[in-house]
Amino acid sequence: MRADKSLSPFEIRVYRHYRIVHGTRVALAFLLTFLIIRLFTIPESTWPLVTMVVIMGPISFWGNVVPRAFERIGGTVLGSILGLIALQLELISLPLMLVWCAAAMFLCGWLALGKKPYQGLLIGVTLAIVVGSPTGEIDTALWRSGDVILGSLLAMLFTGIWPQRAFIHWRIQLAKSLTEYNRVYQSAFSPNLLERPRLESHLQKLLTDAVKMRGLIAPASKETRIPKSIYEGIQTINRNLVCMLELQINAYWATRPSHFVLLNAQKLRDTQHMMQQILLSLVHALYEGNPQPVFANTEKLNDAVEELRQLLNNHHDLKVVETPIYGYVWLNMETAHQLELLSNLICRALRK
């Protein structure tokens, strides 16, 4: 897929309600599978439906479909073979059949806690379905094996129809996170406030949303072939910005005299507006897919430091504590640097 593809309003609306879309797809797949079973009068018709729901339910993004498809189909076929062997062993010796099933379920549990949990799950489910056939009825067992494989193939087919892209979902979530960050930033440092705003819940939500985005990195990297290190770098910077914002708020509202000094620093306010514009441009780039490198103007921040020194000299009679002031300015400089790095990484992620 093209990483720089512009997102239409319809796509944005659909991906913001991706759980509803996925639920609708599962429901339609269930109904179509049911009609296929009834139309062709397939014996043991319960098992294609069960298999389709078990396989299709957890799959949500296209980057997960292909690798998990092979895992699921491989688990289904292996489970069917193990089940058929178990039924043959039952005709020879029941204890031998039980030992065989125990070994197969051990394999199921061992894989379920490894890198291929769905394959282990399907081995166990398919084995249970096949060995549940009446003793000696190999035809029933074969039909059940075929039904499970049919359900797996139908699940893969329906999942591949208009699949959701983890990369697009990642872009929307990152744009949403930066937009919310910008709102909190404006609320915290608004010159119209007399008291410190209560933003703890908003900061916690920003941090929680940033952590949730980590689950999109692996499938998005598979879809776009963009190295995971770029996504990881963006993830780290996004989290760092939230943490630094909390420290900035603490320094900005540390004491009343220092707050007034910061409030009267014109170049510092200009710098704040500059960073807000950077955030808006990054959000626009994520939606439009046409990024332009944004370089933070650190010279303005250096001018702000000089202006603050002059303000401190003019207010020497007010017992102003310099630590929160220079701490706030340094955090602004570091935030600008992080935004510059974030801009470069987003440009690399949205390359043509």
Swiss-Prot record:
Its main location: membrane. Residues 90, 139-147 are periplasmic. GO terms for cellular component: plasma membrane. Residues 1-25, 68, 112-117, 169-352 are cytoplasmic. GO terms for molecular function: transmembrane transporter activity. Keywords: Cell inner membrane, Cell membrane, Membrane, Transmembrane, Transmembrane helix. It is a multi-pass membrane protein. It is found in: Cell inner membrane. The chain crosses the membrane at residues 26-46, 47-67, 69-89, 91-111, 118-138, 148-168. PANTHER family: INNER MEMBRANE PROTEIN YEEA (PTHR30509:SF42), P-HYDROXYBENZOIC ACID EFFLUX PUMP SUBUNIT-RELATED (PTHR30509). This is Inner membrane protein YeeA. The gene is yeeA.
